[in-house]
Amino acid sequence: MAFIHKSGPALCEPFAKLASTAIAVGSVISFTSGYVSQAVKESVRLAGVAVRKIASTDDDFASATTISVIVPSSEDIFEADVTGTATQANVGKQYDISTTNAGTSQTVVLANTTYKVVTVVGFISASKVYVKFNGNYVFANKAN
């Protein structure tokens, strides 16, 4: 699935995308040489969440055109799928995101806590949670 914005101000900013790279709508985005592309699990400086899908069939796929990105603030909450089984005990803990092929949205990996890019702030079901992004935003409660 995807990271779906549920509450907060949802500030959208335009960023130039990396040319010839697929991006899933609702995927976590990071910077690559000044352009945005899908984040990998090692990405700790995140740009936000993609609002638009970029596919190889798009007219601007091979160009570094701009796409809208929701830039998370301390108030923004996102619904996210998990890899593993979520429980109420996950609330308040920090986790990594998955690394997926470009064009496929990431999940929160409940077994991985190396990079800690999200904090679970609410339990929805065994397969979904609410999260806030850590990174370089105010909500982060770890040293950068």
Q: Where are the predicted features?
A:
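Surface-exposed, low-hydrophobicity beta-strand/loop segments enriched in small/polar/acidic residues
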Residues: M1-N144
